[in-house]
Swiss-Prot record:
Main subcellular location of this protein, as a coarse class: cytoplasm
Family, per entry: Belongs to the class-II aminoacyl-tRNA synthetase family. HisZ subfamily.
Coiled coil: none
Protein name from the UniProt record: ATP phosphoribosyltransferase regulatory subunit
Function: Required for the first step of histidine biosynthesis. May allow the feedback regulation of ATP phosphoribosyltransferase activity by histidine.
Pathway(s): Amino-acid biosynthesis; L-histidine biosynthesis; L-histidine from 5-phospho-alpha-D-ribose 1-diphosphate: step 1/9
Length: 272
């Protein structure tokens, strides 16, 4: 496919996405790639993100190029509440001076059934329009770390070693028998079963992970991995997250996660 054909295919995929989810009764939203920001309203995490954002000042006003749709929509709907419970979007995101096209969905005040239906529809779009399918799925939950590791041990060094899966370092700091070390020693496909030995069966994170595992099995996805190493990109990500890796285009990953800040939601996004 030459450059012109790739450009046409990309634009067609964007349009097809909007048509598909408009037909499924999602509200279509279109926000400017340029965000107008108020320094007084930016929190510590917002300021930390500025390192990857392109921003400038004009007449005492700060402007920045969009780097995250979920964050932009959450910020906007916190100021201007919407009655919509499910929205669909397409557009550019710019991170570290690199631009990409993203398509995605947001479910507000989400129920499990609505989120799973959104994921099901998203995968159907991938199959029909992108001619691809999900090869394997990664599940995780941002409450797992607190369930497995005492707060006093959640130091930057230890968190970094968990993220890097540095077993030798973790053994030194935590011990060989520590639950995190024992879980990470297992194949990621087995870790969800191993997890049951280290946290109560009625722990909300484990219950939710098991519900999703059963649902994914019913959809025909058997290759499911657990990730206990991921740490939330923003503090409002407090629940389950999912990554659906593609069979044909291995660079593409459909990602999603639950968040609760000024608004509660579950977002799903794919970079084309």
């Amino acid at each position: 496919m030459n450059n012109s054909e790739q450009l046409i295919a990309l634009k067609e995929s964007e349009t097809a996405f909007l048509k598909y989810f408009n037909k499924a009764d999602y509200e279509l939203v279109d926000f400017s790639v340029v965000e107008k920001l108020d320094w007084k309203q930016l929190n510590h995490e917002d300021l930390q993100q500025m390192g990857e954002r392109n921003f400038w000042q004009h007449e005492h006003q700060i402007y920045a190029l969009r780097n995250d749709f979920t964050d932009q929509l959450l910020r906007y709907y916190s100021m201007y509440p919407t009655a919509a419970t499910k929205v669909a979007y397409t557009g550019l995101i710019i991170r570290n001076n690199e631009a990409a096209v993203q398509v995605g969905l947001e479910n507000y005040a989400p129920s499990l059934a609505n989120v799973q239906q959104s994921l099901k529809l998203f995968i159907q779009f991938i199959q029909q329009q992108l001619r691809d399918n999900v090869h394997f799925v990664v599940l995780g939950h941002y409450q797992l770390l607190d369930a497995l590791l005492d707060k006093s041990l959640q130091t930057p060094d230890i968190l970094s070693m968990i993220e890097e899966r540095n077993l030798s370092g973790l053994v030194t700091y935590l011990s060989t028998e520590h639950p995190i070390v024992q879980i990470l020693k297992e194949n990621t496909q087995q870790q969800l079963n191993v997890l049951e030995h280290y946290i109560p069966n009625d722990h909300p994170a484990l219950v939710e992970l098991k519900i999703w595992e059963r649902w994914l099995h019913k959809q025909g996805y058997k290759d499911i991995h657990l990730d206990i190493t991921a740490q939330p990109p923003r503090s409002y990500y407090t629940g389950l997250f999912i990554q659906c890796h593609f069979a044909e285009n291995e660079s593409r990953v459909l990602t999603g996660g639950y968040y609760k800040g000024s608004i509660e939601g579950f977002g799903l996004g794919l970079t084309l």
